[in-house]
Each structure stands twice: as structure tokens, then as C-alpha cells.
Amino acid sequence: LIPAILIMLTSLGISFVRPIFVLFVETLDINKNYLPTITGALYSIVGVFSVFSAYWWGKKVESFGLQKSIVVASILTATMYLLHAFITNPYYLIPVRTFLGFGYGALMPLLFTRISNNVNKDRRGGVLGIGSSFQVMGNLVGPLLGGYAGAAIGFSYSFFFTAAIFLLIAIAGYASLRD
């Protein structure tokens, strides 16, 4: 159950800032005519590096360990969200979003691997289905909470809160997920 909850928290954290990200980028010093293009590119950076990092993490997990990989990826993701709160120049978002993608690309595959490794083959499909349901729940709740938080407490605090979610994942991953 703990890996499924961590999957939900990861999805929640990933989707938490989606409703406010365009508004956040708009506050930076950019040409407003290019706002959709710039925001789309900044989202794409995360996606591209997630794809490449998933492969890299998959190779490294054998030597590094599953628990340690989850903790490191969560801390990396938390750190990148924390940096978002202090960014005033849109060009600084490029490396931050790159490393954010590197952390993202690890978390979901690692958490699903954790579930898969600890369940009998005859129960694996059902348990992975539960994990997927928790992922969907996080994707549904995250934008709702994120939009509310962005309006209520502001963009910077929303990034702090998201960083705290990923630190919680790191702590829970360290405390409860043993290799």
C-alpha cells in the first residue's frame, strides 16, 4: 500500500503546479507574444529528459539499489521545485526543468518496479492496477489543489509545497521501502 500511496503523491506533486505554471512563467521577463511557445517548450524539456532519464535510471538501479534511487530522484525533484520559487529569469528555468525531468523520469518506473518486485505473479496485475488507480487519483487531485493553492497562497509557496511533497516521498521511501 505504501508504494501505491507514494505513486499517488508523485502524481499529485507532478500535476500540482500545472494550473499555475503558465501564470508563473507570465510573471517572468518574457515577450508575452511568445508565452504559449515558451511555456510549451519548458514543459517539453521535462518530458524529453524524463524519457532519457528513465532509461538511465533503469540501468543504474541494479547497482545503486531501488530504495536509494527513489530517495535520490525524490530529493532531486524536490530541489528543482524549490528552485522554481526563486527564479526571476526565464532562462534559469531551462536547466531547472532539465533536472526536474531527470528526477521525474525515475520516480514512476521505480515505484511501479517496487510494487512489481514485492507481489506474487498471480496478484501482480491487480496490485499494479491499484497502483495505476492511485496514479490517476493523484493526477485528478493535484491540479485541483494546485490551482487553489496558487490562488490562495501564491506561486512561490505552491512550489515550496510541491517540494515538500517530494521530500515526504523521499522520507517515506527511505523509511519504508527496503531493497
Task: Place the predicted regions along the sequence by residue.
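Paired small-residue
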Residues: M80, Y91-F99
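Helix-to-loop junctions at the C-terminal end of transmembrane segments
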Residues: F52-L66, G150
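Short amphipathic helix-loop junctions that connect adjacent transmembrane helices
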Residues: P19-T37
